[in-house]
A protein has these predicted regions:
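Transmembrane helix-loop-helix hairpins at lipid-water interfaces of multipass membrane proteins
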Residues: 1-40, 61-115, 122, 196-200, ...
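Juxtamembrane helix-loop junctions of ABC transporter transmembrane domains
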Residues: 26-43, 66-67, 74-87, 108-155, ...
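A short amphipathic helical element positioned immediately N-terminal to and/or at the very start
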Residues: 43-56, 158
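Short intracellular "coupling" helices and adjacent cytoplasmic loop segments at the cytosolic face
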Residues: 55, 93, 128, 136-160, ...
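An intracellular "coupling" helix at the cytosolic face of ABC transporter transmembrane type-1 domains
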Residues: 55-59, 147-148, 164-173, 177, ...
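Helix-loop-helix
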Residues: 92-94, 100, 193-207, 277-356, ...
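ABC-type nucleotide-binding domain
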Residues: 363, 370-371, 377-628
Length: 628
């Protein structure tokens, strides 16, 4: 060790270059398909948008930055202090000097721990606020999408975006950014400190870095693939659960529990296998780095011990026992952030991929947007007119073809026809759930495309066959928009639509619990609650889509009575399953394959012996046969 070993010098140079390459390589963006889907957004663009959410909390991040500097100072200074204490102990020293050194070390340690704690608390609070803001924006954007756009996105995928992907982004703010920066500066700071302390021992440590670089390249390749599999399998199982738990009653009715269980088992095993692969990759990488760490320690003890025993100097630097202790601590602090750096940059790329998936949802432009000159409607008389309206869900496959009709204020108009004739589509277009391709739809003489969507829908009350009730109480499901409505007014509406018949029998009345989707109530009871919800908000136009289908006779009588009362509220549009429920309608429009075949009153259509007559006769004979 009297002269510098050339091989040691070469190894040190290669090691230094490897450190820089390690940091640079970890920063390289993944390929477009690296995270399992076609990436089109640059990392810089993703970070810019994410930092837009972090901007309101810039002051807190500045504070965290100073706390990180304090932590880095401890990582660099503590080995020097311990090394100094070691030299005091082995030499002639006074207890006062030892006490001072120990006190300084303890003070630095306590200060560092306090800084780390405050840093974690601030980051967690800020990170959760940022993710809360992002989730709210994402949820609000999903609410703005049209029915057609929502039909194209599986619910399970949306749930994954709002939960799993935002959690990955949360890790970026609460952990990754700060620790990545900290680890990079710790590595460089320790490298400078070791060079300042002893060149030769530093070059020895750097000889091991090329191996770490090699392991990192291999690790990143396999860990990225493993993470992609876990992420894809998680999305797949979330989508499967969302669909099958919602339809579990159908599964039970048809006795398909075993088949569905087998499908779920396969997806669960796929996720388990992917997770095991991810664990294996991390389980191999860490021991390899640890092996290099142990090897460097052994070399330190050998070279350092030989240099210390032989009292060797190199470029004026001597190797004392304090130097060996200091290097021992530095090597530990040097290898740990290198190992973490490789893993954290991999998680960063995964978080960026999750961010892109979230932003890909937020970048979907809503099909239904207000025109720049859209107007608010203070009131609606209920005059509705279709003028040569054409509409298709799929380009070229027309669902409505040149439909024209006029509904006068306070009229009751019914739409009948076979499945797929366009009845429900007409009602959806009136509420602007979809955008029609040709023609005009007028409300009180105003094109609905020139009316603000929120204003338009505020004047409509929709009662569908498949009534959706939210988890909560009967009261919360009836009032929906306005929580300050008194119980007296709610019960008045319930009596009006005959919903009080079953509400009064419940133990908690309006405070009775409503479980998910209202599954603890019958179809008829859910329908009556839907009527109450609609009437309470005083709509000018009421829309009933198969509202009396699939209910028992007793409840149907209550609903029929409710419908008769509601006819006086305003304009009523009905899609009827049972023709007996629309005999008193002011106008009945008969549809077939998206075209109007005939229209008129019940008696006029029967006298015409057209399509309505055929439908009514078939249904009448069926009802007679059912009675027999």
């Amino acid at each position: 060790m009297m002269s510098l070993n050339p091989l040691l010098l070469v190894g040190g140079v290669i090691g230094t270059v490897s450190v820089l390459l390690l940091i640079a390589y970890a920063c390289v963006k993944d390929k477009k398909t690296a995270m399992g889907f076609e990436r089109s957004m640059a990392d810089g663009e993703i970070l810019r948008r994410l930092f837009g959410y972090a901007k309101p909390y810039l002051r807190q991040f500045v504070v965290v930055g100073f706390l990180v500097l304090f932590s880095i100072s401890y990582d660099i200074a503590s080995p020097l202090i311990v090394g100094y204490i070691e030299e005091l102990v082995v030499g002639d020293f006074e207890l006062k000097s030892l006490y001072v050194s120990v006190a300084v070390y303890a003070g630095v340690l306590v200060f560092s721990m306090a800084s780390t704690y405050l840093q974690a608390v601030i980051l967690q609070r800020v990170g959760q606020r940022i993710i809360s803001d992002l989730r709210e924006d994402l949820f609000t954007h999903i609410e703005s999408l049209s029915h057609g756009q929502l039909n194209d996105i599986p619910v399970g995928k949306l749930v994954t975006r709002v939960t799993n992907d935002t959690n990955a982004i949360s890790m970026m703010f609460t952990n990754l950014f700060v620790n990545l920066t900290k680890n990079a500066f710790v590595i460089l700071g320790i490298l400078v400190a070791m060079l300042f302390l002893n060149y030769e021992l530093t070059l020895m440590v750097l000889c091991f870095v090329p191996f770490i670089l090699l392991f990192t390249v291999i690790f990143r390749k396999f860990s990225r693939r493993a993470y992609r599999k876990v992420k894809d399998a998680t999305t797949e199982i979330n989508t499967y659960l969302s669909e099958n738990l919602s339809g579990i009653k159908v599964t039970q009715i048809f006795g398909r529990e075993d088949e569905k269980m087998e499908e779920f088992r396969q997806k669960s095993q796929t996720l388990a296998k992917a997770t095991q692969e991810q664990i294996f990759v991390f389980g191999v990488f860490r021991p390899l780095v640890y092996m290099l760490y142990i090897s460097s320690i052994l070399c330190l003890f050998y070279l350092g011990g030989m240099g210390h025993l032989n009292h060797v100097t190199f470029l004026g630097q001597t190797i004392s026992s304090g130097t060996i202790v200091t290097f021992y601590m530095y090597i530990s602090k040097f290898f740990t952030p290198i190992q973490n750096l490789a893993e954290q940059f991999n998680w960063l790329q995964s978080a960026l991929a999750s961010s892109e998936k979230v932003f890909s949802i937020m970048d979907i432009q809503p099909q239904m947007v207000d025109a720049p000159d859209a107007v608010e409607l203070d009131e609606v008389k209920g005059d509705i007119e279709f003028r040569d309206v054409w509409f298709s869900y799929i380009p070229g496959e027309w669902v409505l073809q040149g439909v024209s009709f006029h509904v006068e204020p306070r009229q009751t108009v019914a739409f009948v026809g076979s499945t797929g004739s366009g009845k429900s589509t007409i009602l959806s277009l009136i509420c602007r759930n979809y955008e029609f391709q040709k023609g005009e739809i007028l409300i009180d003489g105003i094109d609905i495309r020139k009316i603000k969507i929120s204003s338009l829908r505020r004047h409509f009350g929709q009662m569908l066959q498949d009534v959706f009730l939210f988890s909560g109480t009967i009261r919360s499901n009836i009032v929906l928009r306005e929580e300050n409505i008194p119980d007296e007014e709610i019960m008045k509406v319930c009596r009006y639509v005959n919903a009080d018949h079953f509400i009064n029998k419940l133990e908690h009345g309006l405070d009775e619990e409503v479980r998910e989707r209202g599954n603890n109530f019958s179809a008829g009871q859910r329908q009556l609650l839907s009527f109450a919800r609609t009437i309470l908000h005083k709509p000018s136009v009421m829309i009933l889509d198969e509202a009396t289908a699939n209910i028992d006779t007793e409840t149907e009588l209550l609903i029929q009575d409710s419908l008769e009362k509601m006819r006086s509220v305003g304009t009523m549009l009905i899609v009827a399953h049972r023709l007996s429920t629309i005999q008193h309608a002011d106008n009945i429009i008969v549809l077939s394959r998206g075209k109007i075949l005939e229209q008129g009153t019940h008696q006029q259509l029967l006298a015409a012996h057209g399509r309505y007559y055929q439908l009514y006769t078939l249904q009448y004979h069926k009802e007679q046969m059912d009675k027999q």
